[in-house]
């Protein structure tokens, strides 16, 4: 428990919020703050509820299998106070953590905001202070740790880590969801930034990590590092990327780490003028860096050049019999984050871009850096792929992912769209791909419901890969409340249980399952 950086805790570092943040500036000198939420990104289902509390024994339709015992943690970006930035992006909301605690066929909910420096100081000031997404030059006061802690929540050595890729993690209590403070791995964190997608090797029990813009905004520095099960840092490699681009997710195999760069580029001078941190660049490829996982130097990285496109979330990567890397991920041919267009304002319209499940083949021994088009594993418009984590970094047979099925009748768009609000991606179903047989099962929750990212839970520790349950949070636009569906992978098309929430939870980004049987919060390998 000595690994929490209490010296960086917001209240201790900054005293009485606004007045101490910028010498000579008093709260009354700040521009007026809005008193209510405005714009489509905080309308309809996206309107912040700002709920914190405990709900015991949630309503259940059907039966939750009693073998399901553990906790489903998820995080959503939800502004605690109205932003002074007009129609602030969904990504800039405060991290609000859900814990669904399962035991004996029952489930309880706990909901807490992460007490980041931003959250604490804005609560004290009773107004928004943080400016544009990842642009510190637009803040009303100076922040030491600018994180919103709103992207992912993972379990590590007895605590939760709330993650945002521009900052160090925040540590939380897994049972109470109390925030402990900024976490720097007992002084070992080498980078200013920490990925929102660390990978957990089920065999070595390592947490494999990286930070991009690792020396600050606009820097091309990447720091790759890993921590062993004893909490000690095991690998540290500094490397330089071809561009200062977004690296939201990455992949890990037994012997390599892989860094796909989204062609959204940062320019600090643009930021200083009040512009966005990110701007799409149609002139560059989608770089994919490959680095040996053990004993590497920065010069060992190879930057392959994939056809221009958007690197979405990674399902997994593994090495085949030839030693080639098979990288499986969501991939789009244009800018998924359309609200950050190119320098001329060019970009796709909302909902125009589709992402598909792509397989890239990477040969580290080859000097041929341009890559051909990937192969596509399914026809669905998809995102947020998940696997059975017991086979992570090795060849997998099953993938579960969100789909967006545009066929008539699947979703009642005439009813849903006026109630949806804006800013968050849409999916209206899930799919389960069996890579060995090519079979696909699909789950469609109904014409007035949308789905979030799913998680997979093994039926038991000895179950075959992909045999178990899938959980997914649903947005019910008829009742304007949330539901948690439990599905059996033997028949993904029907719910075995539907858990009804008396509150509305905004669309979230990521979540993870911690099973009661997991000794260190992560499953044993198959």
Curated annotation (Swiss-Prot):
<feature type="binding site">
    <location>
        <position position="248"/>
    </location>
    <ligand>
        <name>Fe cation</name>
    </ligand>
</feature>
<feature type="binding site">
    <location>
        <position position="164"/>
    </location>
    <ligand>
        <name>trans-resveratrol</name>
    </ligand>
</feature>
<feature type="binding site">
    <location>
        <position position="510"/>
    </location>
    <ligand>
        <name>Fe cation</name>
    </ligand>
</feature>
<dbReference type="GO" id="GO:0010436">
    <property type="term" value="F:carotenoid dioxygenase activity"/>
</dbReference>
<feature type="binding site">
    <location>
        <position position="133"/>
    </location>
    <ligand>
        <name>piceatannol</name>
    </ligand>
</feature>
<keyword id="KW-0223">Dioxygenase</keyword>
<comment type="similarity">
    <text>Belongs to the carotenoid oxygenase family.</text>
</comment>
<feature type="binding site">
    <location>
        <position position="164"/>
    </location>
    <ligand>
        <name>piceatannol</name>
    </ligand>
</feature>
<feature type="binding site">
    <location>
        <position position="383"/>
    </location>
    <ligand>
        <name>piceatannol</name>
    </ligand>
</feature>
<feature type="binding site">
    <location>
        <position position="383"/>
    </location>
    <ligand>
        <name>trans-resveratrol</name>
    </ligand>
</feature>
<feature type="binding site">
    <location>
        <position position="197"/>
    </location>
    <ligand>
        <name>Fe cation</name>
    </ligand>
</feature>
<dbReference type="Pfam" id="PF03055">
    <property type="entry name" value="RPE65"/>
</dbReference>
<feature type="region of interest" description="Disordered">
    <location>
        <begin position="1"/>
        <end position="33"/>
    </location>
</feature>
<dbReference type="GO" id="GO:0016121">
    <property type="term" value="P:carotene catabolic process"/>
</dbReference>
<comment type="function">
    <text>Dioxygenase that cleaves the interphenyl C-alpha-C-beta double bond of resveratrol to yield 3,5-dihydroxybenzaldehyde and 4-hydroxybenzaldehyde. Also cleaves piceatannol, a compound that differs from resveratrol only in the occurrence of an additional hydroxyl group, which leads to the production of 3,4-dihydroxybenzaldehyde and 3,5-hydroxybenzaldehyde. Is not able to cleave trans-stilbene, 4-monohydroxy-trans-stilbene, 3,5-dihydroxy-trans-stilbene (pinosylvin), trismethoxy-resveratrol, and 3,3',5-trihydroxy-4'-methoxystilbene-3-O-beta-D-glucoside. Is not involved in carotenoid metabolism.</text>
</comment>
<keyword id="KW-0560">Oxidoreductase</keyword>
<dbReference type="InterPro" id="IPR004294">
    <property type="entry name" value="Carotenoid_Oase"/>
</dbReference>
<dbReference type="GO" id="GO:0046872">
    <property type="term" value="F:metal ion binding"/>
</dbReference>
<feature type="binding site">
    <location>
        <position position="313"/>
    </location>
    <ligand>
        <name>Fe cation</name>
    </ligand>
</feature>
<feature type="binding site">
    <location>
        <position position="133"/>
    </location>
    <ligand>
        <name>trans-resveratrol</name>
    </ligand>
</feature>
<keyword id="KW-0408">Iron</keyword>
<keyword id="KW-0479">Metal-binding</keyword>
<protein>
    <recommendedName>
        <fullName>Carotenoid cleavage oxygenase 1</fullName>
        <ecNumber>1.13.11.-</ecNumber>
    </recommendedName>
</protein>
